[in-house]
Amino acid sequence: RAIKDCRTLALGGHVDACDSCGHIQISYNSCRNRHCPKCQGHKRQQWIEARETELLPVPYFHVVFTLPDDLNGLALHKPKIIYDALFRAAWETVEAFTGKHNKAGMISILHTWGQNLSLHPHIHCIIPGGFVDRNGIWKLSKTDGKFLFPVKAMSKVYRAKYVALLRTSDMEIEQSTFDTLFKKEW
C-alpha cells in the first residue's frame, strides 16, 4: 500500500517556502520502499549504467518470459519451485534456439509484479544477438533485427519446457491444470 501512496497526501508532506519571493511548494513524503520506482529510480539508473559497462560490442535483444496467471496460486505457495523452473525453462529455450553445440549468454532478472502491482511473474532477459560456436568463434544470429528468434515458435518451446519441469517437480498438480496451460498461448 505504501508504494501506491508514495509522494501523495496519504503519506503526509511539508511546505517549502522561499523567504525572498514567497513562492510556496508542497512536497509529499516518499514511502522509502526498496521496490518503489519513484523512490529507487536513481538506483535503477545506476544499475543500468553498471551493466552497460559489462556489455560486449554486439547487438542485444530484450526477451520477456512470462507465466500465465493460472500459475499465480502456485507461485505464491511454492515460489522456489515456480521461479527456478521459470529461469531454467527460459535458459533451455534460448539454448534450443542457438543450437546444440553453440554457447549463448543471457542476463535475466525476475519481476513478480506487473505495472499495476498485481502478481505477474516474469523475467526480463538481455540476450546477445549471437553465440560462440564449437570452435570458439563468435557468430551473429540470423535475425531480421527486430526479434532474435521467431516469437511464436519460441513461445511454444518455452511453454513445453516449463510444463515439463512442473511435471518433474515434487508438487502435486492436477492434470486439468496442465491441460489448461497447453490450451493457452504463452
Question: What is each residue range found by the language model?
Answer:
Residues 1-186:
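Beta->alpha loop/short-helix hinge microenvironment recognizer with preference
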